């Protein structure tokens, strides 16, 4: 997952609203959003190369999502970061205990941001800072850096999310995730990947021959605990592959 914007507002009619894009190489095998046969409490996509996932729902209102932190100068981790999301969704352990385990194991992974929560609390963990923070109500954004790093695409996506919060619908969340406008050269971050790649990665929705947005996900959680999750899948150059709509 490479871009997540979300509104966390406990006590509201919709306490959690999430719009997220997963960016990945098209050649990496994966499955779309579905109920997991071996863990029926989990609804998520699946990375078939390593077995984990990037965003999903579990029992008792559990939610988890992850973005990688871009740093080409650091070696890749020994373990797949997607197992951190899968682990939280498949296990029934308290959030504090799970975060303690994540903190202890973080050096085994490449850089990442992890969001985990339920109906009552939402936590963010940044592996570079090795600190877990309980989030107060607000509108937040994550890409391939720290929480709310003001990259152009994150600012655009957060602003677009704010405009639909009065009447959030999956289609409006998916629409904001389809923004393909690239940032001007002067506004690009420098993450060490070169100007051409920085430009490609600067849009909310990324499309190219080999790498791009593979899945766009909209999640709306209601105060009664019901959840509506919609995922669109894409192939090379942004070709639409399908859509999954799940109500829980």
Where are these regions (language model features)?
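N-terminal nucleophile
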Residues: 1-248
């Amino acid at each position: 997952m490479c871009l997540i914007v979300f509104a966390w507002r406990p006590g509201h009619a919709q306490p959690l609203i999430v719009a997220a894009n997963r960016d990945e190489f098209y050649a990496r095998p994966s499955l779309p959003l579905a109920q997991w046969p071996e863990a029926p409490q989990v609804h998520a996509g699946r990375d078939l190369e390593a077995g984990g996932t990037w965003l999903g729902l579990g029992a008792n209102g559990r939610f988890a999502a992850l973005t990688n932190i871009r740093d080409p100068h650091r070696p890749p981790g020994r373990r797949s970061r997607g197992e951190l999301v899968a682990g939280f969704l498949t296990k029934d352990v308290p959030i504090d205990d799970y975060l303690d385990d994540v903190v202890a194991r973080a050096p085994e992974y490449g850089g990442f941001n992890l969001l985990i929560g339920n109906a009552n609390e939402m936590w963010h963990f940044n592996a570079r800072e090795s600190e877990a923070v309980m989030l107060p109500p607000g509108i937040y954004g994550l890409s391939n850096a720290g929480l709310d790093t003001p990259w152009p695409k994150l600012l655009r996506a957060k602003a677009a999310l704010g405009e639909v919060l009065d009447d959030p619908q999956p289609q409006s969340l998916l629409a904001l995730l389809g923004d393909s406008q690239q940032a001007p050269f002067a506004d690009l971050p420098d993450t060490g990947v070169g100007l051409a790649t920085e430009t490609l990665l600067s849009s909310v929705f990324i499309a190219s021959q080999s790498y791009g947005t593979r899945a766009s996900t909209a999640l709306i959680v209601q105060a009664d605990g019901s959840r509506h999750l919609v995922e669109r899948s894409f192939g090379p150059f942004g070709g639409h592959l399908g859509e999954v709509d799940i109500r829980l």
